Each structure stands twice: as structure tokens, then as C-alpha cells.
Amino acid sequence: MNGAESLVATLLKGDVNVCFTNPGTSEMHFVAALDQYEKMRSILCLFEGCATGAADGYFRMQRTPASTLLHLGPGLANGLANLHNAKKASSGIVNIVGEHALDHIKLNAPLTSDIEGIARPVSHWVKTSKSSKDIAIDGAEAIQKARVTPGQIATLILPGDTAWNEGNKPENIEFKNSSNKVSADIIQEGIEALKAAKNPLILVGGAALEEKNLIKIAKIADKMNCQ
């Protein structure tokens, strides 16, 4: 099992089973790994902005993260606009970006760039995985970050040698519950504020706009005579 296969296995273990891709040569080992796992659905997109926009839309509909695969810094740059939108919408995405092999970066090839610097403004979490032995752990951390409520952009940078060198099976990796529960005290504060208001108004956003939650909010609004 190479590093790329280790990462795909980790994604599946973390219930990330869709990858919207626009790869290049640096990502071929990961592309091959995607094809080896039947449970992983790999969707080729003809433009990076399509891949990142599709991942955003997937989260908004399914409320669970998908992954993306982009080619180096320029490929990431082409997908920035929809990563920006996804971050503003609190969509969870595991954003995988290929990188040159670590010992090749110093040669400053035409597509060499500061991928971490490009990714940081549109990501909640950014990490370059520098060893094929660590990619499963780094991938699990990316999934964990993407699942933090209500959703986050986790950018994992995958150098070529991290992908092709021998990796580890993600057997011992565990995923913790990353949901943020609202305390009873905050709920009570909200109730008291609604009771005290002369013309109460409830403003909602994010996951509160899902149908099941809007039904609950409508009942609260009716009970409290809210707008």
C-alpha cells in the first residue's frame, strides 16, 4: 500500500466517499488509488472551479463532506472562488492539492508555488503531508477538521513522493465526534430573550435553513409570537 492508497482508505474509513477531481501528472498515483476502491466515487471535472463548486454543493445537499483533487498551486488558484464561497457557507470539504516531490521543490519548476499560502485564506486548516507513513494520520485529521460543526475547509497538500512511497494501513485511526453541542444555558438565554422582546424576531442561517430545522423554528416562532 503506497501513500496515495493509504489516503483513499482513510477517506473511506472517515465516510468521505466522493472525490471531485481535476488532476495533473503530480496526482497520478492518487488517481490510480481512487480507481482501486469500489466504494470511492471519483468524478472528473473539466475545470477546477467546477470541482470545488461541486464539493460545496454536495455538502449543502448531503450535509457531509466530499473531497476534491486539484493540481498544484495553479490548479488550486483556479478553484479558489468556490472554495471562498464554501468557506463563507460553512461547507465541509477535504480539499486535496497535489505538490511536487519534496526534493524537487527546490528546483523551482514552472508550476512551483506557495500552495499553503494560496490555500490559507480559503481554508480553516492547511497541512502539507511530508511522509507517506504519516498520510493516513494527516488525512484523518483533515476529515476531522472538515466535519467540525457546521463545516470547515480542510486543505491537505499531497507531495508526489508522499503519494508513491510505501504507506500505512489506516487500521488504528479513530474518528472522534466533532459536533459542537449548544449548552442548555445558551438555549435558556435565547428563550428569555424571546419572552422579554416586544416584537421578537428570529434570524437563522446555515444548517438552521434545512427543512427539518425550519419546521422546528416555525413552531418556536408560533409559540413565541415571533416574526
Q: For the regions a protein language model found, what residue spans apply to each?
A:
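N-terminal alpha/beta PP-like core and its mobile active-site loop of ThDP/TPP-dependent enzymes
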Residues: 1-227
